Amino acid sequence: MEPAIVLIISVGAALVAVTGYGIYTAFGPPSRELSDPFEDHED
């Protein structure tokens, strides 16, 4: 394979992995540990 194709596939796979981890953190089980700054702040 061409080195450019390998690089594009590697960068694409890393981007998909980071996006998947972000979605998992935002909406999966770890989201229970996230705090809402608007609820924590009292006027």
Swiss-Prot record:
Keyword Thylakoid in record: yes
Membrane-topology descriptor: Single-pass membrane protein
GO cellular component: plasma membrane-derived thylakoid membrane
Transmembrane segments: 4-24
Location in or out of the cell: Cellular thylakoid membrane
Nucleotide-binding listed as a keyword: no
Keywords, alphabetical: Membrane, Thylakoid, Transmembrane, Transmembrane helix
InterPro entries attached to this UniProt entry: PSII_PsbN (IPR003398)
Domain of life: Bacteria
Pfam families the record matches: PsbN (PF02468)
GO biological process, one term: photosynthesis
Family under the similarity heading: Belongs to the PsbN family.
Protein's job: May play a role in photosystem I and II biogenesis.
HAMAP family: PSII_PsbN
Name of this chain's protein: Protein PsbN
Organism: Nostoc sp. (strain PCC 7120 / SAG 25.82 / UTEX 2576)
Lineage: Bacteria, Bacillati, Cyanobacteriota, Cyanophyceae, Nostocales
Gene: psbN
